[in-house]
Amino acid sequence: MRLFGTAGIRGTLWEKVTPELAMKVGMAVGTYKSGKALVGRDGRTSSVMLKNAMISGLLSTGMEVLDADLIPTPALAWGTRKLADAGVMITASHNPPTDNGVKVFNGDGTEFYVEQERGLEEIIFSGNFRKARWDEIKPVRNVEVIPDYINAVLDFVGHETNLKVLYDGANGAGSLVAPYLLREMGAKVLSVNAHVDGHFPGRKPEPRYENIAYLGKLVRELGVDLAIAQDGDADRIAVFDEKGNYVDEDTVIALFAKLYVEEHGGGTVVVSIDTGSRIDAVVERAGGRVVRIPLGQPHDGIKRYKAIFAAEPWKLVHPKFGPWIDPFVTMGLLIKLIDENGPLSELVKEIPTYYLKKANVLCPDEYKAEVVRRAAEEVERKLSSEIKEVLTISGFRIALNDGSWILIRPSGTEPKIRVVAEAPTEKRRDELFEMAYSTVSRIVKEAEKK
């Protein structure tokens, strides 16, 4: 049995995620690590309860606990590197309000590597926890991380602006940072959904286009230069240009990949397997190379390939600042890029166009591995004469000779299978997507009938 997926532990409250589990994870972290642990939480209704259980587990092992309380995940990672030997974040990121979860960080701000997560699971399942003597149990110390974190981002970005920016915080923890960061940069900030509320009353927390499409109209009505949207724990960023057009996540990645490769005169960019061909096109043209890695492991890719930049959809890592996903650095650098090079609508014209479609197929967790394998094998047979490369990390990514690709992978956080297709034309994309989606849907039904 696995507790950790591609983004830590995540699941529905009381079904998978409970105070008992949080306490055991805390006990396991305190057994695996020693010294100080920085603990934070997002704004979900269950996060205070789970944070307190986590703290109890950590204290029981003798660790000293620093309580950052309500904080965005990137700020928790930064604070861990500055203050502690380990970090723990109570969050379910962009999941529905019924869910919650746990992310664990090393003292350098990296998320726990897969082998470390397996180590925690072994400790939890064995019950072999360290138990502190009565005189080893330390008091909890409350710490304020956010002001110093904002200053660190400001220093790193090193730019002042007079842009007008619309910010949508998804009623999440990012609302404690982004409006203040942008204002300190000199921007005129207009905010929506910027009060923290674990019910997520403004919109669904995931910043997919369908959840934030209304921002395009607001951009045009308010005359802003840029709109930024985040998720519940503020590790994701989505953007609209000054004309109200949504800038898809691969284009944002491609803009930054191009920037870093040009600055370095080459270098390696690591991206997750669900990213598109436009990234390869701009990186190779600029003299760099792209390496695709499993989902949830950009920090591992940075270390393994000495990467100058890493990204997943909506999640960008700026290694010079830190080895964690940091959208606050992203928004600061994006504003700098716009000020120095022109409107975002013009910048994206430098990125080649590919057409992407994605959807989820509901699938019970126990069938996901079989369904993904069978569906990928069937799609490979149908496209055998066109295949350029097949990557079998975090699922199956089937790349074709014309630059098209199909991805079939199990979700690491939900009972779903992700299906993605991208191609140079909409017609080709639709053909590939329909083939993959219908194949996965049929095999799920067959598996459920067994």
From Swiss-Prot:
Belongs to the phosphohexose mutase family. Mg(2+) binds at residues 93, 231, 233, 235. This is Phosphopentomutase. Optimum pH is 7.5. Pfam families: PGM_PMM_I, PGM_PMM_II, PGM_PMM_III, PGM_PMM_IV. Keywords: Isomerase, Magnesium, Metal-binding, Phosphoprotein. The active site is at 93 (phosphoserine intermediate). Activated by phosphorylation. Catalyzes the conversion of deoxyribose 1-phosphate to deoxyribose 5-phosphate. Also shows weak activity with glucose 1-phosphate and mannose 1-phosphate. Could be involved in pentose biosynthesis. Homotetramer. It catalyses: alpha-D-ribose 1-phosphate = D-ribose 5-phosphate; 2-deoxy-alpha-D-ribose 1-phosphate = 2-deoxy-D-ribose 5-phosphate. Optimum temperature is 90 degrees Celsius. GO terms for biological process: carbohydrate metabolic process.
